[in-house]
UniProtKB/Swiss-Prot annotation:
Pfam families recorded: Pro_isomerase (PF00160), TPR_1 (PF00515)
Ranges in a coiled coil: none
Molecular function, one GO term: peptidyl-prolyl cis-trans isomerase activity
Protein name: Peptidyl-prolyl cis-trans isomerase CYP7
Lineage: Eukaryota, Fungi, Dikarya, Ascomycota, Saccharomycotina
Keyword Repeat: yes
Provenance organism: Saccharomyces cerevisiae (strain ATCC 204508 / S288c) (Baker's yeast)
Reactions catalysed, as given in the entry: [protein]-peptidylproline (omega=180) = [protein]-peptidylproline (omega=0)
Length: 393
């Protein structure tokens, strides 16, 4: 095994692919723990368990999720079986160091191949990999967790053996799943595949875009990004602009889904870092102007994705803002009107086209739209009149 090897976990939620988590393992600091996790990802160690040919995390579920703390998986005794009761999942585990004799003779515990602690350090950063245990020293097997926040109460109690290097947004997606009172996800969150990772394999992502086109090197969630500080409003504005332009490049390629993800991401950065006017008035205005552009872009890309209700929503967000330039208001009315038209809400479409004309009277295209919708409305009225006359004839 190479120094600090890389492994991956592909995640699905209710059988829908979400994305890939890539982890770097600390072989030198935690050699035995790393070997165990590496092999369980590779899935090439024969299993001492009756119902499994090889020990593997593949098919294993995340059985405990605590927001602002951690996500936990790795019970390959109960957590990989679809018919296991929720009360059983989380009570088992099996490391690569277990053998058939131990499994056969141990009829009290469902945790096999327990091994010693290593690298009992401090959990000061999110996305740290740690081994779950039985609440006492040297009881590691296969269960592991990924922190989503600093966890000082775990310091010195759990082996630290790696960190997430790619796919942090996938971890956040799991963290944000709805859970019951015991932290059990209401959805079926599973490791659909796993193994040893190489750069040529990429980092698939299905609910966001990690395409770096246009220079977008920023994390999906602003809190996870380390390129600038919380009060560096200039850098934050630059990042939000770069992300927006990345979306526009994708839009021009007609990659509407990923363009939407980029615009949504840019909006998240704007909402996270926009200063109050009394803190930095100039930057506040710049952020607001960028937010207007993002609302317009979101309305347009969602229209192209045939998500008309969402397109209407973002156009409305813009129209509810203060001091919106007439040209931008015209664009918002036009795009919202187009969405209303697609939904056959003709009266609302006509009203928005009229408002658009008021804000941009020189636009000849909008005049054609108004005539077209008026004609549709008259045709519908004529059909209604004919139907009524048939009813009484």
């Amino acid at each position: 095994m190479i120094q600090d090897p890389l492994v991956y976990l592909d995640i699905s939620i209710d059988k829908k692919p979400i994305g890939r988590i890539v982890c770097k393992l600390f072989r030198e600091k935690a050699p035995k723990t790393t070997e165990n996790f590496y092999k369980l990802c590779a899935g090439d160690v024969k299993s001492p368990l009756k119902d499994q040919q090889y020990l593997s995390y593949k098919g294993n579920g995340f059985h405990r999720v605590v927001k602002n703390f951690m996500i936990q998986a790795g019970d390959i005794v109960f957590g990989t079986q679809k018919d296991s009761s929720s009360s059983s999942v989380g009570k088992g585990g099996c490391s690569i160091y277990a053998d058939k004799e131990e499994v056969k003779t141990d009829d009290e515990s469902f945790c096999y191949g327990n091994f010693e602690d290593e690298n009992l350090g401090e959990f000061v950063e999110p996305f740290t990999l740690g081994m779950a245990n039985l609440g006492s020293p040297n009881t590691n097997n296969s269960q592991f967790f990924i922190t989503t926040y600093a966890a000082p109460h775990l310091n010195g109690k759990h082996s630290i053996f790696g960190q997430v290097v790619h796919g942090k947004s996938v971890v956040r997606t799991i963290e944000n799943c709805r859970v019951d009172s015991d932290g059990v996800p209401e959805s079926d969150v599973r490791i659909s595949d796993c193994g040893v990772w190489e750069k040529t394999m990429g980092v698939p992502l299905y609910n966001a875009s990690n395409d770096q086109i246009g220079g977008d090197v920023y994390e999906e969630y602003p809190d996870d990004d380390t390129h600038f500080g919380d009060d560096d409003f200039g850098k934050a504005l630059e990042a939000a602009n770069i992300i927006k332009e990345s979306g526009t490049l994708l839009f021009k390629k007609k990659d509407y889904s990923n363009a939407f993800f980029k615009y949504r991401k840019s909006l998240n950065y704007i909402n996270e870092y926009m200063p109050e006017p009394d803190v930095d008035k100039e930057r506040n205005i710049q952020f607001i102007n960028l937010k207007m552009k993002i609302y317009l872009n979101l309305s347009l890309v969602l229209f192209n994705l045939e998500r008309y209700d969402d397109a209407i929503m973002y156009a409305t967000y813009l129209l509810e803002m203060d001091n919106v330039p007439n040209r931008d208001q015209a664009k918002a009315y036009y795009r919202r009107g187009n969405s209303y038209l697609k939904k056959k809400r003709l009266d609302e479409a006509l009203q928005d086209y009229i408002f658009c004309k008021e804000k941009n009277p020189d636009d000849e295209v909008i005049e054609q739209r108004i005539e077209y919708v008026n004609r549709l409305i008259e045709e519908n009225k004529e059909k209604t009149r004919k139907n009524i006359s048939k009813f009484f004839s």
